[in-house]
């Protein structure tokens, strides 16, 4: 299951504020019952009344050991879930909105420091607070999200590498599919999108196959190229720049993934009979060369399409994004959990205790992600998680929910690729544990 081939002008960079939680701050990994990171001046409970969640479980800084019989044995424990540990939420709803609430953009962290979250449109400042948490040579951007009065507010973190571009490998295949959806919508006067079928195949099932690498019946790499043929490579590159993300010219997107496109065809039909036929783009596009900031920002904007109207990918509809996130609706092949929920990588999940996350959210959590693996052992992942806290009446408890995006690339480190996979999982655990307990 290996992978194949912000704001306009780029973010400013800020140092860690006084009192920022470091490796030895109170409530570290392995410490239970520490502060939650509530809003300044708010009592715990908020919208959920006086409800206070259970204390945090002790989280070992080391991810789980390798199981006795990994399958396939020559793949990777966390990138490929060779121990079969992947979990899905018990609450099914394709129209899910993260039930996380905060009363103020001023957030008090576990160490008592107060940090400000900003709404979309505010100048982006990236705080370099991750340097001591991640391996040397790792590229990483984290976007923390707080919903204040239903409006998302953001705080960006990195280790100073957020603007450094690299080959993002297979993490970009979902962006190729998103671009394809956009082109189909515009070409069909918005009547055809990723909800359609081509050549007898539901596009949503093909998106799932991109993410879970089941080769049934096409390869993930070939499907990545197919979606570039549909969306167009020049347009894919434009999305990185003036058309959508406003990133620098040094970042480019439009390269293929090392396999030929399958013979699916380019005539698309919706269940209601709407059709469109397009001419495929078979040109060679610019190489894929993106930063972790760009990868994280793109996924953030896709997931928050409904909330952030000014940051929407042009042309795409929410039903297309539902297809990216969950796969085809009512899929007889994959069931309710397709699309990016089927990514084989479990870096977000091993970042904390999945039983605790399931219980405190009453099953109403989500993780959408996409892995990448380079030919020289570059381990990558980009993903979004919503981990709310609900009270006994399933109402959100203000100040306790967590919502975040992480884009990471670990190109070096460890004596083997398997050890590098573990190093990346350990870095995710260090970051996510601190997100959950309120130190970040």
Features from the language model and the residues they span:
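Short glycine/serine- and small hydrophobic-enriched flexible loop segments
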Residues: 178-186, 225, 297-304, 433
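Active-site-adjacent helix/loop patches that line small-molecule binding or acyl-intermediate pockets
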Residues: 96-129, 137, 198-312, 316
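Structured C-terminal helix/loop/strand segments within mature extracytoplasmic catalytic/sensor domains
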Residues: 52-124, 287, 300-440
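Extracytoplasmic
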Residues: 135-139, 161-163, 167-172, 290, ...
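Short, well-structured active-site flanking segments
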Residues: 182-208
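Short, conserved catalytic-motif segment at the N-terminal edge
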Residues: 134-165, 181
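Ser/Thr-rich, Pro/Gly/Ala-heavy low-complexity intrinsically disordered linkers and tails
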Residues: 1-54
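Active-site SXXK
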Residues: 165-191, 406
């Amino acid at each position: 299951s290996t992978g194949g081939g912000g704001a306009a002008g780029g973010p400013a960079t800020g140092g860690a504020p006084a009192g920022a939680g470091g490796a030895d701050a109170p409530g570290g990994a392995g410490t239970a019952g520490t502060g939650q990171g509530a809003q300044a001046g708010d009592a715990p409970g908020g919208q959920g009344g006086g409800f206070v969640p259970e204390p945090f479980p002790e989280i070992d800084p080391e991810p789980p050991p390798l199981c006795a019989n990994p399958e396939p044995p020559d793949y990777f424990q966390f990138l490929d879930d060779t121990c079969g540990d992947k979990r899905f939420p018990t609450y099914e709803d394709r129209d899910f909105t993260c039930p996380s609430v905060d009363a103020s953009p001023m957030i008090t962290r576990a160490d008592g420091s107060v940090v400000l979250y900003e709404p979309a449109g505010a100048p982006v400042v990236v705080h370099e607070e991750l340097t001591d948490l991640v391996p040397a040579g790792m590229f990483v951007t984290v976007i923390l999200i707080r919903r204040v009065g239903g409006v998302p507010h953001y705080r960006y973190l990195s280790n100073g590498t957020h603007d450094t571009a690299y080959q993002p490998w297979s993490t970009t295949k979902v962006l190729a599919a998103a671009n394809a959806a956009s082109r189909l919508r515009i070409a069909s006067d918005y009547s055809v999108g990723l909800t359609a079928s081509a050549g007898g195949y539901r596009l949503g099932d093909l998106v799932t196959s991109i993410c879970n690498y089941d080769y049934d019946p096409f390869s993930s790499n070939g499907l990545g190229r197919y979606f570039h043929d549909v969306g167009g490579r020049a347009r894919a590159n434009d999305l990185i720049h003036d058309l959508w993300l406003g990133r620098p010219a040094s970042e480019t997107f439009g390269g293929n993934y090392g396999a030929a496109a399958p013979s699916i065809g380019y005539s698309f039909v919706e269940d209601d009979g709407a059709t469109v036929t397009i001419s495929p783009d078979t040109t060679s596009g610019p190489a894929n060369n993106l930063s972790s900031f760009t990868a994280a920002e793109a996924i953030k904007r896709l997931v928050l399409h409904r909330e952030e109207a000014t940051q929407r990918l042009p042309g795409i509809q929410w039903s297309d994004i539902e297809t990216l996130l969950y796969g085809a609706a009512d899929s007889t092949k994959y069931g309710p959990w397709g699309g990016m929920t089927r990514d084989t990588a479990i870096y977000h999940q091993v970042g904390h205790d999945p039983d605790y996350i399931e219980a405190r959210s009453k099953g109403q959590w989500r993780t959408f992600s996409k892995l990448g693996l380079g030919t020289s052992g570059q381990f990558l992942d980009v993903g979004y998680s919503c981990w709310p806290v609900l009270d006994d009446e399933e109402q959100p408890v203000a100040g306790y929910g967590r919502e975040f995006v992480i884009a990471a690339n670990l190109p070096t480190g460890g004596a083997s690729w398997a050890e590098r996979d573990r190093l990346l999982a350990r870095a995710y655990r260090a970051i996510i544990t601190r997100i959950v307990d309120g130190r970040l």
